[in-house]
Curated annotation (Swiss-Prot):
S-adenosyl-L-methionine binds at T75, D95, D119, A120. HAMAP family: MenG_UbiE_methyltr (MF_01813). Keywords: Menaquinone biosynthesis, Methyltransferase, S-adenosyl-L-methionine, Transferase, Ubiquinone biosynthesis. The lineage of its organism: Bacteria, Pseudomonadati, Thermodesulfobacteriota, Desulfobulbia, Desulfobulbales. This is Ubiquinone/menaquinone biosynthesis C-methyltransferase UbiE. It comes from Desulfotalea psychrophila (strain LSv54 / DSM 12343).
Amino acid sequence: MRAQSCSLFLEMKCREEFVLSKGPGVEKMFDAIAGRYDLMNKVMTMGQDQRWRRFVVAKAGDPGAGQVLDLATGTGDIAALMHRSYPRAQVTGGDFSRNMLEEAKKRFAGQGIDWQVCDANKLPFADNTFEAVTFGYLLRNVDDASSVLAEVYRVLKPGGRCVCLDTTPPAKNIIYPFVQFYFRYGIPLLGRMIAADEAAYAYLSGSTMEFHSAEVLADLFRGAGFVDVHYKKFMLGTIGIHWGVK
């Protein structure tokens, strides 16, 4: 009973912080967990997170000497992998969390990646700038996913690719109770032990369960104008990677 009460309290606390607008609360949250973000990702995903990032970069494709943007870049893993995979590309990593960007700059110093503070709701780039735009764990953390997708569509060149990695609510099948238990209790507990921030990871769990299904997210891509939209699920259906073409 005590564990259930604590979990419910954390969910209510997180909803109070984010109900009006996710922006300020999410920015503050990511600033707070920046130092332990990478370790927590590895533990929480059982080491599968790098595999997913490689899949994202492969789906983005080789931009040649063109420009690519990794939004919600966090501590820079996808941007750095893009740079290593396609060394001729001009890579920009953007995030609205300054602390996350500071971690990215320290981790990948001297690699020629352009790190920029930017808001996905209003990108500081001209129309038709990028050959590809990637992002991980962005759309679940914004107020209006359709608006952000429209903004990504705007800055992509015609024929450019958008690739999105995010959590998705698992299907309600025979293993659903076990997945739900891990999200509701396991992840917040890991957050408390590793990142010293149980509330932030209770938010992750709650927002995942309330986020769009992979099918609905694919429809949002199409609604923003993207064509040839596909997706692939990972980790018992709790991770989805979507991609589409402008």
